[in-house]
Amino acid sequence: LSLEVLAVLIFVVVVGGVIAVVIRAVRGRGKQEEEGGLDLIPYLILAIAVAAAGFALAALARASLTPDRLIGRPTGELAGALASLVVAAPITYLLWRRQARRRKTFPATPGWPVYLAIIELVFLIAFLTAVSQLADFLAGDGEQADWTDLLIYGAIVVFHWWAERREAPRGDIGDLPRLVGSGVALVALTIGLIGTLEWLFSFAYEALWGLGDIPDPAIPIALAVAGAAIWAWRWLPSWEAEPNVLRNFYLGFVTAFSLIMAIGAGVSMIATLLTFVLGEAGPAVDHFDAFPLALSFSIVGWALWYHHGHRLGPGRTGGRRGYEYAMAATGLGTLVGSTTALVAAVFTPTLAGTNSGSTLLTIACAVIASGWVWLTFWRKAQAAPRAEEARALSRRIYLIGMAIILGLTAAGSLIAALVVVFRALLGEIEADTASLRIPVTLTLTAGFATWHLFDQIRADGSGAKTIESKPFAVTVICSHPGTLATLFPDEATVRVLYRGDDAGMIDEEMASAIVAAVDRRSSLVWVDESGFRLAAARES
């Protein structure tokens, strides 16, 4: 047997075994009122089957619609595609019909949005890859235009968009498919915009100075157009549900990443300009040849930051907290690393030559920028009431996570420094004490940052203990409380009365606002489609 046939047989055995286990488990657990975690397994198998069938169909289309038709194609490639399609197509059909019936009984199953997100991730990437390959071919650089990939991958994506609109995912992860599609499209849009702007700026740079390399704009323009269309379709339409944990995480991550991209490009341009002004650079034409790319990164980064930052919402929302603590973590980590690099650059004799000034200026700019980022966002976090801020999950992740990372870094660098010291004390002639600069500096900077973080953890804990622990009761009338009960302190007694409709759902942002508004007082909370209302409860 060939390797392709053997691979298909293994695939059939594995899939058949998994299906048998799933069917046996489903039959054995009896009828349940709610869908359990096992529902994820059929959807994962369905996703694998759809992916296998889709890529096999694309391979067959490429083979049949090219000028040489099937002639000259490797036999194993065609046999593997045919075998995959024969096996995957029936599995796809049967599982699709089965899960469609189960969705009518269990409409809030978590497997449906997970399946849609997997398909969107896989086939959107495949579709955008086909777009770039076709653009490269049309520009005269590619060898072959597999335009059939566009049709097949695009048809699969559009079909699942239609299925999603027909049966909208529900539950806490119902937004997952749209967020995945928005993220993939945003990456393509970002790459396309940066490449297109770099081409425009490089063209202007070459026209002014007569030198420089002009990149090919075909792929960036194609990615920008395709990414913008998909992103506008998946992200810009209004969202039915209020912001939840997933959307807050997405917004916080994208906002933080875009600002990091903009600041990093800005630091690079400032360092390049200062190096030239201070006479530490070569010819201007060669020195500024990286400016078009850095300027493109900066423009796109600021644009993305502006767009997503305005959607974080006012006040201390979950998304805004995540964004600010992510920026504080990035600033603190970069500050520790760049400070260590600056000390090493200052005291390294080999940098006394030609480019020592440019290296020092670049690292110094990084130190200043990272310090400014950390101070700015840490002060924003400190401006919020500590009693409310100390309970935020993003703050705990920042303090504990960074304390562990920087603490381990300080411990590792201290061990490295002690190894050098002990080697010298033991009389090893080749022991170079000059190598102590980096581990000692890293031990001091990371150790000081770790001490600061643990001090804040201790202050948060002591601040929580000093708060009056008077018991109080809260009665909430809503459709679903979400994580509200977990945000109240231990002395709170929370009672939930369900409305019986979907008009009073509580998301993470509203839950934090309710806890802040209650302020450790016995209260009645009414939640409807317009928000929540609060009334003081009579204490017995």
Residue spans for each PLM region:
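Hydrophobic/aromatic interaction determinants used to assemble and anchor large protein complexes
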Residues: 1-413, 418-478, 486-502, 513-531, ...
